[in-house]
Swiss-Prot record:
Any one biological process term the GO annotation gives: UDP biosynthetic process
Binding-site residues, ATP: 9-12, 51, 55, 158, 164, 167
Annotated UMP binding sites: 69, 130-137
Activity regulation remarks: Inhibited by UTP.
Record localization: Cytoplasm
Top-rank lineage group of the source organism: Bacteria
Oligomeric form and interacting partners: Homohexamer.
Protein name as it appears in the record: Uridylate kinase
Associated pathway: Pyrimidine metabolism; CTP biosynthesis via de novo pathway; UDP from UMP (UMPK route): step 1/1
Pfam families: AA_kinase (PF00696)
Length: 233
């Protein structure tokens, strides 16, 4: 096994098949992929977005940016609870920790407690982003990965198996990269994660792997050291 502890960044859109809401079938399908990775023995932390419930850039037009971001943070907590439920239905012990304190439904984010959960072979899902407006869930993923000592950030995609020179769904000439440096991603303006998140990973030397989570065996393959997707380092 190549990695002992990883952070998996998920899009909220993985929890639905029609673009909006939380669908049990889609959530269960995602949970099964995660369980297969968990069964390898890897310590697994997760950060999930909220694109299935709230798009601040679109729905928050005319709204104060901080307010729109807080709504997005609450939506990530809803997604975290749905994913926790799906994982526990498969027998995977899972804890949700949130950057915004909602003690009735989840633990507050406490780094040492998160580390303890990982050591006890529990999956930890971090909800609420960083807890601050103006920061994306990509940045939350980079931040939490560094805090818990993850060896890599796994950026899950759907139907895109890595980083391409252009959108492969629109441009059949687009070329997939096997490896990129952080600076290449920034200088080319490649849509991997936002600039703040990439810079955080670059300064810490934290590698990123971009891959298709619904490609059978992809997530397990990365953990076991196979060359899957695009490595950014």
């Amino acid at each position: 096994m190549k990695y002992k502890r990883v952070l998996l960044k998920l899009s909220g859109e993985f929890l639905t098949r029609n673009g909006f809401g939380i669908e049990p079938e889609a959530t269960q399908a995602l949970a099964r992929e995660i369980k297969a990775a968990y069964d390898t023995g890897v310590q697994l932390a997760i950060v999930i977005g909220a694109g299935n419930l709230w798009r601040g850039a679109r729905q928050g037009v005319g709204m104060d940016r901080a307010t729109a971001d807080y709504i997005g943070m609450l939506a990530t907590i809803m997604n975290a609870l749905a994913l926790q439920d799906a994982l526990e239905s498969l027998g995977v012990p899972t804890r949700v920790q949130t950057a915004l304190t909602i003690t009735q439904v989840a633990e507050p984010y406490i780094r040492r407690r998160a580390l303890r959960h990982l050591e006890k072979e529990r999956i930890v899902i971090f909800g609420g982003g960083t807890g601050n407006p103006f920061f994306s869930t990509d940045t939350a993923a980079a931040l939490r990965a560094l805090e818990v000592g993850a060896e890599v950030v796994l950026m899950a995609k759907n139907k895109v198996d890595g980083v391409y020179s252009d959108d492969p769904r629109k441009n059949p000439e687009a070329v997939r990269f096997d490896e990129l440096t952080y600076l290449e991603v920034l200088n080319r303006g490649l849509q991997v994660m936002d600039t703040t998140a990439i810079t955080l990973c670059m300064e810490a030397g934290l590698p990123i792997v971009v891959f298709d989570i619904f490609k059978p065996g992809a997530l397990v393959g990365i953990i076991q050291g196979e060359k899957v997707g695009t490595l950014i380092h």
